[in-house]
């Protein structure tokens, strides 16, 4: 079955019993604020261009958000590095196939991500394997923890109210 969403690159995650689930704190759910603004830590919106790399762009944004929240040194993650490695997991390197969010997050948990200055977002290179130096440097920037948010309105609001963004997907037609 083909799950590809035309042109934009998101593929739905299939259920996986190994997912670590996030549950918003009960006390947070009991007192959800009317409004939550996480924008002070949000990076500038990325432009994926004509490449189906939306999951890599969203994951890079979450990484950059988290680094800002932790007051770590400025770092723009390499979206092309993430896109290559999530497609490597899915065995689709030779095509602009899009990817599952889970595989992109899995790749930054296992391999990390190098700076975009080291592996720039040059669409023509999307099939090219990043350099060995990129992989060595990426290990310094591995995701330590990631969890799947239960797709209910209260859990999504609780996640945001707790100060955490989430990587989400939307079909664009």
Residue ranges and their predicted role:
Residues 3-8, 29-32, 61-64, 88-173:
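Predominantly the structural core of cysteine protease catalytic domains
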Residues 40, 84, 170:
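Pocket-edge structural micro-motifs
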